[in-house]
Amino acid sequence: MQTELDYIKETLTKRIYILFIEKYKGNKLQFAKKVGCDEKAIRLIFDKNQGMTINLFFKIASALEIDPSELIKDLKINK
């Protein structure tokens, strides 16, 4: 199960990163301000594969102007 969770976190982070690059051209400070968090939090998510709270996840989705469900589409834990 942990392997699946790690895969989900990695995939979600990649999806967010791709949209971040498209919308914010790699400007982590601008993105962090729009999200409402520290730039350090954004760096940790992207560079260190740090997890995120559900609140931060929704703020990130809002800053990327995407429905949160689109970011997690097709991500699931197999039984």
What label would you give each PLM region?
Residues 13-16, 59-63:
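Short, basic, alpha-helical segments at the C-terminal edge of helix-turn-helix-like DNA-binding modules
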Residues 35, 63-64:
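Core residues of bacterial helix-turn-helix
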